[in-house]
Amino acid sequence: MGNATQVETDSAALMAEPRLVAETGVAARIAHIATPVLADLGYRLVRVKLSAQDGMTVQIMAERPDGAMTVNDCEAVSAALSPALDVEDVVKQAYRLEISSPGIDRPLVRVSDFRRALDQEARIELRLGLDGRKRFRGLIKGVTGAGAAAVVTLERVDAKPGEAVEAVLPLDDLAEAKLVLTEELIRAALRAAKAALAEEGEPEEQEEGGGEAAPAGKAERGPGRFTPKPAKAKSAQGKPVKAKPVLPAGVKTQFKQLKSGRLQGLAREGAPALRPTPK
């Protein structure tokens, strides 16, 4: 009983945790609309980004308090957020709505993100800078303080001869931060996925010829990147059936809505979410 109460308390604290970065202009207005909609569903906003390449795209990155985000989560967010954006009419032109998880090499937008990323490599950019320098790259070795008063200790991998290897960066000056996609980061994500499956009592699948077991339902980032693709199931009519994978935290998830209105979940990068233009 006590553990359940503590989990609920921790989850509530994470939901209420403010972001350290903020959008500007139209993206800021979208973030203002999206935040309460996401909160009502139990999700947190990570960031909003607008892209004008190949038409206007509104990219909204969200997550659960524990960092997880499945295809079904993306679908739920899209279904709730799309009408809210329609009512407010923030974007004055036709656009595509893309809902995604933060992914493995995720942005770091809250103090808790930095705490979870201890010993991982990150790129951090400050607004004003420290000793004339704005961009840093290195291993996150510690986080002290809370909120905007927190500071991050970085063991720099970009330090030149004569420069200090350790940098203490104030998060109230944070402009942007993101994890660097490394082999260690991928292994850590896979270990976390296996641990999550073990807690749920899901059996682990052993790869042929020995080696590390791959978590069931894990989405691939590319052909053969982590595990061979399973054989496609077929319906009674002989047509392939696409199953929605259940993804662990850290695996990139995206969602798109086709023009016909049929919803299709995706578990790969680079697939935009197409939002039908109201007639």
From Swiss-Prot:
GO BP field: ribosomal small subunit assembly; translation
Cross-referenced InterPro entries: Ribosome_maturation_RimP (IPR003728), RimP_C (IPR028998), RimP_C_sf (IPR036847), RimP_N (IPR028989), RimP_N_sf (IPR035956)
Localization per Swiss-Prot or TrEMBL: Cytoplasm
Presence of the UniProt keyword Cytoplasm in the record: yes
Gene Ontology cellular component list: cytosol
Entry keywords, A to Z: Cytoplasm, Ribosome biogenesis
UniProt-listed Pfam families: DUF150_C, RimP_N
Comp. bias regions, Acidic residues: 199-210
Cysteine-cysteine disulfides: none
Residue ranges of the region described as Disordered: 197-279
Family: Belongs to the RimP family.
Physiological role: Required for maturation of 30S ribosomal subunits.
HAMAP family: RimP
UniProt xrefs under PANTHER family: RIBOSOME MATURATION FACTOR RIMP
Protein name (database record): Ribosome maturation factor RimP
Phylogenetic lineage: Bacteria, Pseudomonadati, Pseudomonadota, Alphaproteobacteria, Hyphomicrobiales
